[in-house]
Amino acid sequence: MSAPNQNTLWARTFVSELAASGVDTVCISPGSRSTPLTVAFDRHDSIETFSHLDERSAAYFALGRARRTGSVTPVVCTSGTAAANYHPAVIEASQARVPLLVLTADRPPELHDSGANQTVDQTKLYGDAVRWFHDIGEPEPTARKLRSLRTTAARSIMTATDTPAGPVHLNFPFRKPLEPTPVPGDIPDDLSEESITGRDGAFVESTTGNRVLDENSVNRIAQSLSTSRGLIVVGPMTIPGVDPEAVAAFAHASGFPVLADPLSGIRYGGLTRTTPIIGGYDGYLTSELWDQWPDPDVVLRFGASPTSKPLRQYLESTSPTQYLVDPAGEWREATFTATDIVVADPTQLLWQLSRALNTPGSSTWRQRWIEADKAHTDVLANTDSSAHQSLAATNSDSSTDDIIENTDEEGSNESDRWFCEGRILSDVMTAAPDPATIFVSNSMPVRDLDRFGSPTTQNRTVLGNRGASGIDGIISTALGAGSALATTEHLIAITGDLAYYHDMNGLAALERCDVTATIVLINNDGGGIFHKLPIESYDPPFTTQFVTPHGLDFEPTEDIYDLSFARVRGTDRDGFHTAFTEATTTTGSHVIEVVTDSESSHRVREQLHDRVIKRILDN
């Protein structure tokens, strides 16, 4: 591997070692100072490159690909504020445990604190949001330094994929010439072949294992779980997550129902055929109900904190014994009600506990949850569209209560029935092709999916940025996930209007990175989620400072980014079905804008919640 100068040798050596360690994709933000790295990645036969015009979008795209694959995705940029634009995605990767490798180019040391252009302090730029920061130092073509460089490459991959996974930041100072320009005498003639080419395979091979509890610890926990009323709660998890078969085995051995977050990897798929997967709890877990139910004795929890606030409040209020299982031993339970933390691999622990349990729990307890979830599903399925249609009508004199009361209890067979934004989420989950990767935005979409996205046997990989839960970078993250899909799997992104506005430039990746997507844009003209908060009662400033209606017309994105754009009203369910079916059965990328009213949707959510509670209590 001859090189024209030491910058080129340095970058080639590093990139070749990443490839030997399994890296097959990189996202590149164009820039001058990062030229050695960019050229090395671009010329490596085993690495696919994605070029991005915007640094923030590039980082989120890399995040999305790493989230979908579970493998490290590097992202490269030049010096200065380019690196700062990676910060939001780095924070998300850290909190969501996604393996990301950030490679920032830098100016030589003497240019720092000198007023030199495009020069900022990039040392530990991302603070404690990274698992490891290392300044590579200037290129030095010696055997020892090249071994160190290869070792650093291997270590960066090991650290990013360790437990917990997360981002790693490596900083590369380069002097000119940055291009692969021949520089006589730049590479010593006596440099050994191994120093230049490395070893066969990775320079440092990594072998890792899972944390497995000893038999006494397993038996102690199993004894506590040998009770009539228990729950399995699976919060958001990052791929590979927990093995569904292990969850099923423990659910059958214990008799416990499984409360599965939509981002858990458990709510959807074949597991639902044989295992009591509960998905509607966000729609009925209130004190009115749990005061009528016996409290759970014990809860076995996996993953991050559940999306559902009612579920978190239920666990806090009933105060059961709570085992928080985390392979990294980190605390991810913000109500501080967990009684035990178990540092173990979730899948291995479930298999161990399944073998150790002697008696299953109460079938009456399990059936209570199954029937409550069925009541929730039935109410949603049998609610007529007239509720939402009337609420959305201009200058309507009818109250929400009147409209709900006048709705036929058994519903309607009309295809054009609609009641709130949540129905969009449930219809997408039902009508999406099989298989599909579905990326859901923060704010209301993920909450509506939690409440309205009933468990299904269809193959759905549901992703979202629930680490730091920002609404920035949603489109870019979704398209990054889509870049990793086989041609037979569809990508569907569901986003609100503010998140869409935040990341419209991310749509450039559709063409630049050859990604195809169906994007469902729920446009309620502002921050509809604030209707769920007490500030709604204070107007002003509620409308101008929180809801922030914008009146933006998103249709021009059709021409800017060469995609198909359709607009339907939230009361036109048949129209949405037609547009969604066309989008998912024809070539190219599509945006389906569904125009809704956030306030009326919120009121209907409340009334549907009341109806579900009534149905459960009456039974």
Swiss-Prot record:
Record's compositionally biased regions (Polar residues): 385-398
Protein's UniProt keywords contain Phosphoprotein: no
Pathway: Quinol/quinone metabolism; 1,4-dihydroxy-2-naphthoate biosynthesis; 1,4-dihydroxy-2-naphthoate from chorismate: step 2/7; Quinol/quinone metabolism; menaquinone biosynthesis
Compositionally biased intervals (Acidic residues): 399-413
Cofactor field: Mg(2+); Mn(2+); thiamine diphosphate
GO biological process: menaquinone biosynthetic process; organic acid metabolic process; sulfur compound biosynthetic process
One GO molecular-function entry: manganese ion binding
Keywords on record: Magnesium, Manganese, Menaquinone biosynthesis, Metal-binding, Thiamine pyrophosphate, Transferase
Pfam families registered for this protein in UniProt: TPP_enzyme_C, TPP_enzyme_M_2, TPP_enzyme_N
Top-level class of the enzyme under EC nomenclature: transferase
Subunit details: Homodimer.
HAMAP family documented for this protein: MenD
Function (record text): Catalyzes the thiamine diphosphate-dependent decarboxylation of 2-oxoglutarate and the subsequent addition of the resulting succinic semialdehyde-thiamine pyrophosphate anion to isochorismate to yield 2-succinyl-5-enolpyruvyl-6-hydroxy-3-cyclohexene-1-carboxylate (SEPHCHC).
Family indicated by similarity: Belongs to the TPP enzyme family. MenD subfamily.
PANTHER family (UniProt xref): 2-SUCCINYL-5-ENOLPYRUVYL-6-HYDROXY-3-CYCLOHEXENE-1-CARBOXYLATE SYNTHASE, PROTEIN PHYLLO, CHLOROPLASTIC
Protein name, per record: 2-succinyl-5-enolpyruvyl-6-hydroxy-3-cyclohexene-1-carboxylate synthase
Organism annotation: Haloquadratum walsbyi (strain DSM 16790 / HBSQ001)
Gene expressing this chain: menD
